[in-house]
Amino acid sequence: MMKNTHLFAFILCLASSIASAQARPYPGPDVQQLYQHYLEVVSHIAAFDHHAHPGFADDPDVDAMAAPPGSAAFRERETNPELVAAAKALWGYPYNDFSAEHAKWLIQKKAEVKKQYPGTAYFSMLLDKLNFDRGVANRALMPDYLDPKRFPWVFFVDSFLWPFDNSKERARNGDQQVYIPLQEKMLHRWMQQEKLSALPISFADYLKFISQVLEDNQKNKGGIAIKFEVAYFRPLHFSDPTREEAEAIYKKYAKGGVPSEPEYRAFQDFIFRYLITEGGRLKLPVHIHSAVGIGDYFNISESNIMQLENVLRDPRYSGTTFVMIHGGYPLEREAIWLAAMKNVYMESSLMEIVMYPAAFKDALKQWLETFPDKVTFGTDCFPYNDVLGAEESYWLGNQSARQGLAAALAEMVSSGEITDAKAIEMAHAYLHDTAVSLYPSLGH
């Protein structure tokens, strides 16, 4: 055992000396041993989950929208044996499938554990199991079963873009028939919060209403960031209309009438830019869904991350922090270059789920080789149903990300790109430190 320890210490010293010379174009024979080493290292880092939707399957406030019927990517389907592995690891699940009869065991087991961990204790226990320090709760509203100290809230703001008669928007396709009514519901919730029974009469008061919601959610409800999933509803390219143009549209349609598509887009473009400006003023980072999406009608060409470049590189928003949720997947190779902007960060959730660890390792490695101080970890956990809940989703995202990270670091060290010390520093930054640094109110 002592001989093996000395041998591995020698390998690390050798790798460190190589890193000071020219990097090799391929890893060496030590890569597997290095992988095991970094897998051990990253498993002991308490992570900060930068994007997730924790909650129970019967909770309507887990998200501000719902998924229309459609097919999931191969790895996300219930037939994935890794999900059985998740149930075994978390709950001691004794079966090798999720047949209806076997799934009853899992549902009952979770019910028993919930009784053992009442109130906020259940999900806090889950974070402890996963070795998470904290995990963002990106939800419509916060429930009483999540401890806000462990689950800081990121709240949705898309609904402010949809204040008018949306009948024409809903009729565009089946996805919008699901999405738009939920945005209308969310807007009315914000109005009730601010004690409004109808839209404000003036445009100035509508903007004041938006700002008041942001301030209330930050000061009184613990909100740490705002979130857009606007790519599901419309193209991600935002023009730059004047306030006067937006005000004229509001005045025309606030009391009724159906806007034309160009009118609605111009109004939304102004409101989007107003919201990100307010995010900068209030020090609320702006999270934006930047990847491919679910549903039959998600338009990748119009809603991919590069459509945001004119906004992200606009010097007027240099005081706003942007977090690109899901890292622009499947354009993650291009997306990382947006992080050259000092106020733009990448977040890797979804990627580690739709890609297996071998592919995710390559994507994460490219990020770490480019802007390692601008990339963050997330799981995108979601409670799909009573059997496969947020718990199993958390587990798979956590396992995949840590495995991919360990493999990426092993290859980088073995190829002489970085030292062992730099690899460990990168691991802490990706899993925890970089994301936490964006939210001073959380402390470190």
Predicted feature locations:
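Histidine/acidic residue-rich metal-binding segments in metalloenzymes
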Residues: 203-228, 235-344, 359-376
